[in-house]
UniProtKB/Swiss-Prot annotation:
Gene3D superfamilies: Protein of unknown function DUF1054. It comes from the Bacteria. This is UPF0637 protein SaurJH9_1166. Belongs to the UPF0637 family. Coiled coil: none annotated.
Amino acid sequence: MTKYTFKPKDFKAFNVEGLDARMEALNEYIRPQLHELGEYFSDFFTSQTGETFYPHVAKHARRSVNPPKDTWVAFATSKRGYKMLPHFQIGMFEDQLFVMFGIMHEAKDKATRAKVFERKFKAIQQLPDDYRVCLDHMKPDKPFIKDLTDDDLKEAIQRAINVKKGEFFIARAITPQDKRLKSDKAFIAFLEETFDQFLPFYSA
């Protein structure tokens, strides 16, 4: 019995038709692990940064028709929410588990906060080859950093700084069949390794 990780069948919750039925599937197959991950990693971030972090598991409460295509737990230093702050995420689409750190378009002082990625441009380029960027958290697309030109990356960061709807996340993503999802131990190790790479961008 696993506590934190996800099986390939859990991702099939996103194939369930209809809002109510899909929410039931998410509640059964995915949200329990997200809550456990929320407890574990809010303590992890609090320990690593010296600031108190709070977990926020997606509720999808505003939806009335369209079922969610993704779900997540986010970590930020506010009890009230995470969208207005730089934050960490663990989440899922039907074809991927993703891990991210960055700034959403709704963030307060977004232009100032997003400049961390401008300052640490070289550090982004030096992330391992399987690290990616996400420029729209609502879409599954996450190009590999190694596949972007310097100009592509600079333009993406500038968009997050200067355009109202712009956002920028550094990310990592794995498939539902990935061996790092086979056990809690392997999954937690993967997540901690990823967040260790992200933390210097938070504290910069």
